[in-house]
A protein has these predicted regions:
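RNase H-like nuclease fold core
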Residues: 1-51, 62-63
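Residue-centric detector for conserved, function-critical "anchor" positions
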Residues: 127
Length: 141
């Protein structure tokens, strides 16, 4: 089974000098407590956080289905309201499990993750930095 921990962040700071429009979406792909891949997308465009979270789930699942040729997937999200979306209901009907994780940052407990927003942190520091941090500090020794 593959687990996907999704997160997304939308920022509109154009009211400040040097402000940006940015949407970041990420899916951490885990098998047997090991990160096997990371799906990540950042655009210089603002969309609602609801839409960004939904896209993070849909695109991460599509990526795993094509790259790993499996439908044995559980998605972990911190957005409870997404369970009511038509596209997420279709995903569930197709056999994908979608679980709500209470609080910020799905995978925080499972991955012992200690930052508030996974997507923001990866956006600032890079995927490899996060992956190295995970393997060095967060995996049980």
């Amino acid at each position: 089974m593959i687990h996907i921990y999704t997160d997304a962040s939308s920022k509109d700071t154009t009211m400040y000098p040097g402000g940006v429009l940015r949407t970041t979406k990420v899916g951490i792909i885990v098998r047997n407590s090991n990160i096997i891949d990371v799906w990540f997308k950042r655009k210089e465009k603002f969309i609602s956080s609801h839409e960004a979270e939904k896209q993070a789930i849909l695109y991460s699942v599509a990526y795993v289905r094509s790259e790993y040729e499996t439908n044995d997937i559980t998605v972990h999200t911190d957005e409870k309201h997404l369970m009511q979306c038509k596209s997420i209901k279709k995903l569930i009907a197709s056999g994908i499990r979608v679980e709500y994780v209470k609080g910020h940052c799905p995978g925080r407990k499972e991955l012992k993750y200690k930052f508030n927003c996974l997507a923001d942190w990866i956006s600032r520091n890079g995927i490899n930095t996060w992956r190295n941090y995970y393997y060095r500090h967060l995996l049980p020794q």
